[in-house]
């Protein structure tokens, strides 16, 4: 939801150019990355991916069926494909096996760790995100303590996020560096020790059921050690862990709406 219209148009252009230049017949999977408003191609694969079921549902187009027909000689023009804009936001939420494999680190890397996906579908981002969380077996809390620890590059952006959590009734607990910048910007928060700094530390608070949500964007070797300890405790006590600023923003929107205000429709009702 944070891509500009210009960026989306450029991605569409690059996709079309790559598909034509590579003489693609059937499906093609392209992974893009964006940094400092520049778009990069990570890899291109002449195959389907797990994204196909997702986009087939949100567009109401059986892409796998059409790809098979193209592969055996049909032309795209013969299939009469039409773009559908239904005015909904779709959130794809990965499902991780962390509760089954507690030794796995909850913080992500290029390595594939998810074992499935669910979709949250709504006209508003907050509602779509909340539905995706529920579908993945997680219910976002409506009150309690939010633990925040972010790296230096995220500290300016975390200010408005912490302020929003205060506004919707959460108390803030933060590590020393994050706590300092929040207090300096008029956001009341309590300081807590990192792992290895003293006791009680953040892991102790998690085990004492004193934490409702964790926002942690680690960077560096010591932070990675902390993340492992925090993540392991969070899995054990079923506490949501948010590892990006954009994820924290979406969580706030979802909590503002609340699970009781969600409405549900089948895909058949949406696309009729």
What role is predicted for each listed range?
Residues 193-194, 202-272:
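Peripheral docking tails and interdomain loops at the edges
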Residues 47, 151-153, 218-222:
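Short glycine-rich anion-binding loops that position phosphate/pyrophosphate groups of nucleotides
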Residues 1-142:
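ATP-dependent carboxylate activation and anion-phosphoryl transfer catalytic cores
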Residues 169-181:
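Short internal beta-strands
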Residues 161-167, 183, 231, 235:
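Surface-exposed amphipathic alpha-helices with a cationic face
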Residues 134-146, 165, 205-211:
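Glycine-rich phosphate/diphosphate-binding loops that line cofactor/substrate pockets in enzymes
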């Amino acid at each position: 939801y944070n891509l500009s219209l210009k960026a989306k148009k450029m991605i569409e252009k690059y996709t079309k150019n790559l598909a034509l230049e590579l003489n693609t017949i059937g499906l093609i999977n392209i992974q893009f990355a964006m940094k400092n408003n520049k778009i990069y191609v990570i890899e291109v694969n002449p195959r389907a991916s797990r994204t196909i079921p997702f986009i087939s549902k949100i567009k109401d187009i059986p892409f796998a069926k059409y790809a098979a027909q193209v592969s055996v000689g049909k032309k795209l023009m013969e299939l009469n494909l039409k773009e559908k804009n239904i005015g909904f936001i779709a959130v794809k939420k990965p499902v991780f096996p962390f509760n089954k494999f507690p030794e796995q680190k909850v913080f992500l890397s290029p390595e594939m760790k998810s074992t499935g996906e669910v979709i949250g579908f709504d006209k508003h981002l907050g509602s779509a995100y909340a539905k995706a969380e529920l579908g993945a077996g997680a219910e976002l809390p409506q009150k309690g303590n939010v633990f925040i620890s972010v790296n230096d590059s995220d500290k300016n952006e975390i200010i408005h996020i912490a302020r929003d959590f205060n506004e919707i009734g959460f108390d803030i607990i933060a590590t020393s560096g994050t706590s300092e910048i929040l207090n300096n910007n008029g956001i009341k928060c309590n300081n807590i020790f990192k792992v290895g700094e003293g006791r009680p530390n953040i892991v102790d608070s998690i085990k004492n059921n004193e934490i409702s949500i964790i926002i942690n964007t680690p960077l560096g070797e010591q932070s990675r050690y902390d993340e492992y300890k925090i993540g392991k405790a969070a899995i054990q006590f079923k506490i949501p862990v948010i590892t990006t600023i954009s994820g924290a923003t979406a969580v706030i929107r979802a909590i503002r709406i609340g699970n009781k205000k969600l409405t549900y429709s089948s895909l058949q009702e949406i696309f009729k």
